[in-house]
Amino acid sequence: MTSLSPYKIVNFFSIEATTTLTHRVLKKVELLSRVFDHSTSKYLKGFRLLTLGWSDGNSFSGIDFALLSSAKEKNRYNEINPGIDKRTCGYQRRKEAITKSTKLLEPMVKNAIKIGIQAKYLVMDSWFSIPSVISTLRNHIHIICMLKDLPNWLYEYKGKKLRLKDLYGKLKKKRGKAKIKASVLVTLPDGKKARIIFVPCDKKRGWLALLSTDISIADEEIIRLYGKRWDIEVFFKMCKQHLKLVKEIQIRNYDGLIGHTSLVMARYNILTLFQRESVDQRSFGDLFRACNEELASITFIDALKRIMQLAMSVLRKAHNLSETIINSILDLIMGEAIAYFGLNNSPMPQLKGDWG
């Protein structure tokens, strides 16, 4: 069936990590460690939940996770239970817990693709946008991510390897309140091309940088898709505040923590499916998009005209007013509305006298 929507629906993966805390008294939790919480910029006792999710821009589902301790032995309060059989999945999970998060990104993405989950992009925050990681992941899927300005993260432009702020200084910027200040094609350390766009922000330096390994898409689409990464932040908030992630258990066993996290993620996915099928009209698919397209095709002036026609019909039925008075009232309202929305100087269709 041919899609009735003028906008292409893009499926994508999103990956992010958040800090999960254990109860203060459970100091003997297996693999408990000091983990850095980026939101508070402090070290806390607990784990980091690295999550891979899937989204079509409307619904989000968690599809894989790793419950991470610290890769540094000095930051771990407790080690792996020596009684665990090394041939079991539980032991593999424990080995995964003491692996750097950047080393887990590729196997998580490969496993998701292997089981048949379709996505065109992987959207990431700046914590994972290391050039070497991007080069590894782009062998499997296109990457869209925010970039950090670090001295050893270099991008080749016109034969010179530049850090991000130096690259920005070389580019011609758009003036005024442009949504995109600059856009450029660069070469990554692996020799492959990527697009970097700079957008304005309120930070001291005045810009943020986004990278896409797919150089065929528009700059505006890169911004739109990166903005959809917010869904995974909502996922974490829902799991912590409403689905009782970590809060409903007191357990020392690492397998128990994995099982609990799996159940919380399953609850969220069930709620997402229920909302999509029972509440969200987008579950009607192309029928919804056809109706939505019809609504979008009505211009502001056409919509306002229809409202005025309805108001005129009500006035005729409810009050004994002459056509001259009714038209004067509607002309006054229309004039005020046009002035309010700043459309005085815009080309307008002649609506006066055409209210019937």
Where are these regions (language model features)?
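Active-site-proximal, Lys/Arg-enriched surface segment
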Residues: M1-K72
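Single, function-defining residue in the core of a domain
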Residues: K27-K28, S59-S61, L68-G356
